[in-house]
Amino acid sequence: MAKASYFARRRRDIESVLRRDPAARSALEVVLCYPGYKAVRRHRRAHWLWTHNFKLLARLVSQRTVRKTGIEIHPGAVIGEGLFIDHGDGVVIGETTVIGDNVTLYQGVTLGGTGKDTGKRHPTIGDDVVIGAGAKVLGPFTVGKGSKVGAGSIVLKEVPPNCTVVGNPGRIVRKGSVRCVGPDLDQIHLPDPVKDLSLIHI
């Protein structure tokens, strides 16, 4: 995640929405009407306050954002460029989460911790990852670059790059272009989260 200026990041955040949501018609519409964009923009302010030791003020900004957008991002979370939170209601991103560039999160996603451990306890999400509606990624591990997590999945362990994960608990069903079918999954009923995610826009 290369560091960019505040205005450059805003521009790239807007561009990420326009590029990935066919319902978005203009930059002005994104700025005025998209709660996911608003939450990311406000998080960048809160994160600056957090890293400059204005922690209470950062939390106040964060909580105001929850009330306005329904999206909870802890000000300590590190977020790269081009995060697209589609619809967004119910999204929760924990304090030690790290999110790479050009990540897509759908409504109801939780990037959470496990237990009451201190230190790194939330996931690291690689560049170009897509996480489907209602999915939970819980713990201090990495979801590798280019991977996809199907809607409703619960992921509790490391995901290599360019994999597709579905189910509870999450299981890898595709590595790159190779489909991986476990003993309790068959070819007919195997979910295709990539196809499902492409149809989620309304």
What are these regions (language model features)?
Residues 69, 74-75, 80-81, 86-95, ...:
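Left-handed beta-helix
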